[in-house]
Amino acid sequence: MLPLLLASSSTYRRELLSRLRLPFVCSSPDIDESHRPDESAIELVKRLAEQKARALADSHPAHLIIGSDQVAVLGERIIGKPHTFENAREQLMAASGASVTFLTGLALLNSQTGHCQVDCVPFTVHMRVLDQARVERYLRAEQPYDCAGSFKAEGLGVSLFQSTEGPDATSLIGLPLIRLIDMLLAEGVQIP
């Protein structure tokens, strides 16, 4: 088996990948993550996932490189990481009683052959009706400013959910393991 490389510095993605009990290393790619004009959210996450994997191919010429990228979509609007309390409060209040779809782009690049599998896995969160006091309590408790959508699904953020739907709950945290396993199996990786 070629060595696995996770093209990410995300602790969340690292924790998810470790569930597969396969050895891997991590490296952070340096790419331009800006949204192109007329690019759909699905096209954006697929492109960025593949770019992250390809950015490390030259320095890791015989690896299976995993790239992933995620955006949250509320209505027609892409919402990213809030970075601040104020932005997070605004995002959560806008999502109150609504549905937020998380689109996770996934790429698996065999840097030896150049073959790259790319996909997008959606996951939808139906939010509870939230008031400002509840949102502010949550934000002070968890400070999810580095998370698209302004909550941590693996933590207290689940208290904001009414329900969820999608093919793979791990995609909500940023690395869709079910689809990744399909890709790894196609590359001949044995799991377990």
From Swiss-Prot:
Active site (UniProt): 69
This protein's record includes keyword Nucleotide-binding: no
Pfam families according to UniProt: Maf
Cofactor: a divalent metal cation
Annotated positions for site Important for substrate specificity: 12, 70, 154
Keywords assigned by UniProt, alphabetized: Cytoplasm, Hydrolase, Nucleotide metabolism
Enzyme Commission identifier(s): 3.6.1.-
Gene Ontology molecular function: nucleoside triphosphate diphosphatase activity
Enzyme's top EC category: hydrolase
Keyword check for Transport: no
InterPro entries assigned: ITPase-like_fam, Maf-like
UniProt catalytic activity: N(7)-methyl-GTP + H2O = N(7)-methyl-GMP + diphosphate + H(+)
Localization (cell): Cytoplasm
One GO term (biological process): nucleotide metabolic process
Gene Ontology cellular component annotations, sorted alphabetically: cytoplasm
NCBIfam families hit by this protein: maf (TIGR00172)
Summary of the function given for this chain in its UniProt record: Nucleoside triphosphate pyrophosphatase that hydrolyzes 7-methyl-GTP (m(7)GTP). May have a dual role in cell division arrest and in preventing the incorporation of modified nucleotides into cellular nucleic acids.
Record-stated family: Belongs to the Maf family. YceF subfamily.
UniProt name for this protein: 7-methyl-GTP pyrophosphatase
Originating organism: Pseudomonas fluorescens (strain Pf0-1)
Higher taxonomy: Bacteria, Pseudomonadati, Pseudomonadota, Gammaproteobacteria, Pseudomonadales
